[in-house]
């Protein structure tokens, strides 16, 4: 009998993320991604759902925006003169850790979503903010690991499996308590 996932186990999962039109919007590589169950490295509902499964299981999890990347916030979209960005020839897709002249220090990154007429649109929302997403999860491997056997720096969680920011994480955790 295959053991059920427990808090602290190292779990390797293959994840495919779908939008509501059944388009794949992201997925892990073939090797999957390894995370520590119950360590709150992924969305709270995903973390909780993993604890109900075992190696070899496949399951779907639908997350609303407030359980994953948050609602789209227009206040996080800024129109900035390109000469204030400090880069030559800014292009769509470029990332910035902050916006010059905008007092924001929450660790949020910004991405240029449009450039034209000497101006750039920088968006601090996660690309999937406001989206309801379906996560198709396959549990590939479960390993019992003793405390201290693996450093947290050895675990890499892709952005599409992590809560976008602390306020979204708190809201998602609150929904679990209801």
Go through the PLM ranges and name each one.
Residues 1-178:
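FKBP-type peptidyl-prolyl cis-trans isomerases
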